[in-house]
Amino acid sequence: EEAVMNIKNIAKKLNVDYESYVLDWEEFKDLQLAFLKASVPEADTPTDIAILAALHKVAAKYGIKYIISGGNFATEGILPKTWHYNAKDLTYFNHIQKKFGTVKLRKFPTFGFQKEMYYKFFKGIKMVYILNYVPFVKDEAMELLRNELDWKYYGGKHYESKYTGFIQSYYLFNKFGIDYRRATFSSQICTGEMSREDGIEQLKAKPYNDEKVQEEKIYIAKKLGVSLEEFETILNLPGHYYRHYPNDEKKLSFIYDTYRKLFKKEKLASF
């Protein structure tokens, strides 16, 4: 609710239109469960795909040519590939859905590289990473949002969604030893926003609160329609990586490398 109010407040303050995109919950929760059962780091790929698809569909609907993204080098410029594989690999996505899912996807908006190219070249829609063009300091940005746009902090990176916050702070850390703070801090150290010593000191504490995590487990299990015991069993499955499942890594790498050469773009990061 807090995250929704943040969005509405910002839209109202900036006098821009607000439109929500509602997913079919039965399909979406089945997808979330499928990725959890696959036991891969990309447990939140259904959310990533839905956001990309919804943004492009709505942009095309209204003839909007630019989508502004908050992705940036300053806080997200460093990320190991095995921590989060390409969400737009539909071979990987579809295999996990068919192997571990129980509901046929009829309404869920998918977004693979074909649709990405369609929207880019036929609809003329571009994703603009505006924060890469200005000096961006996370703490200063948060302060500005609070003071000018009535924004309220929700307790941690990506905790605008309880599920995403849980995945990044607890699931990834316990199953794979992945601590997203290391990636964020590494980027901030490179930009001079944080000292290496400060980052090391902050990493001494766990990325989650034990009491809060237990509450989150109960909440998420209920939302996904499984018992707490079943949810714990899923969480305790041995971890796997995208290479353990069918994927189009080589094909997509070739396509994106060719695209970069044709349009003279440097291979710096996903944004």
List each language-model region with its residue ranges.
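Nucleotide-activated chemistry modules centered on ATP-dependent adenylation/adenylyltransferase
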Residues: 1-271
